[in-house]
Amino acid sequence: MSQNPEARYRLVNARTGEVLADSLHGAFDSASRRKGLLGRESMGEGQALIIAPTNAIHTWFMKFEIDVVFTSKAGLIVKMSQSLKPWRMFAALRGYAAIELPAGRLAATNTIRGDRLRIEVY
């Protein structure tokens, strides 16, 4: 993802063609990675937050459940959690990026471990 504020990005499962999110946001610096989704009341349908580089996240102080996938640099899902509750930690030894999605999105898109995710400009 570039830093172009005009560009729109979506997250697609390469195996199924399903769009996991059509409003993709990145947390690539230290401050934005620390903040993540903290302070939000919910996560909108179609939204996703990519946190990179990281191989661990927490949901401390969060007010809602989320789906989380950890991917390799190549975009392969190495670990995932559905409906991760607040006040939890989640890590993936081989993870490079964490992608946080609204709870239920992984099941709705038939996304499984080993799938490759890709970012598309549209």
Kindly give the residue locations of the regions a language model identified.
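Compact, glycine-rich, soluble single-domain proteins
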Residues: 1-122
